[in-house]
Amino acid sequence: EISECLVGSEMCIRDRKMEEELLTAGLQAVKDNYGDQIKELFGLEVIVPTTPFPVVKLADLYKALEEEFGYTVDESEKGDLTTEAERLSYDWVKKHYGHEFLFITDYSAEKRAFYHMRDENGVPQGYDLIWRGVEITTGAQREHRYEVLKKQAEEKGLADDVKFYLEFFQYGCPPHGGFGLGIDRLTMLLCGQSIKDAEFLFRGPNRLTP
């Protein structure tokens, strides 16, 4: 996971610029150094994205998918992104923005981790990044205030389970944020392979060793 602990971390998480620059530079380096080999072996062109990446609120995305594809979900599911909505979001962003990446924001607090900071309306200050219809990143501004963090853990019935974690925040913690980038998923999508082939040592429900 890539984390930041600095004065401007909140703004960096909100505008997502750091991850855009990281992925753009990384894919440019892959294209420059291995683009020909990837095209020869997998028949795929390494595409370096333009910035900024498109951004959409989750509720607006569901509305757009219904209008565009007739895709609907029950109200109880609209606080999170379904697998089918992930897939359709790629078709939608390609058509309307000519882009392969899509940031999705404004998830339901019920569906996000207790340590995600929320705004004055209770909306988590985080996002998911979708590439080619697959989630590759979850990022967020983290809650650093002990009392707020404790309350959010209690709301999810986790206060006892994360007591050791909460104790650190009693001594003070600066504003911070971060994101976890799924390197295996990134490799899978880059080369057009299955996740089993993209990982060095695949782990799954039926494979724990070696």
Predicted region positions:
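A generic hydrophobic-helix recognition signal that picks specific residues
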Residues: 1, 132-135, 175-177
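A residue-level signal for conserved active-site and pocket-lining positions in enzyme catalytic cores
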Residues: 5, 61, 104, 139, ...
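Residues in well-ordered beta-strands of folded domains
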Residues: 104-105, 130, 137, 199-201
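Composition- and surface-driven signal marking solvent-exposed, interaction-prone regions
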Residues: 16-19, 116-118, 141-142, 199-202
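Short, glycine-/Ser/Thr-/acidic-enriched flexible segments
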Residues: 9, 107-111, 119, 134-136, ...
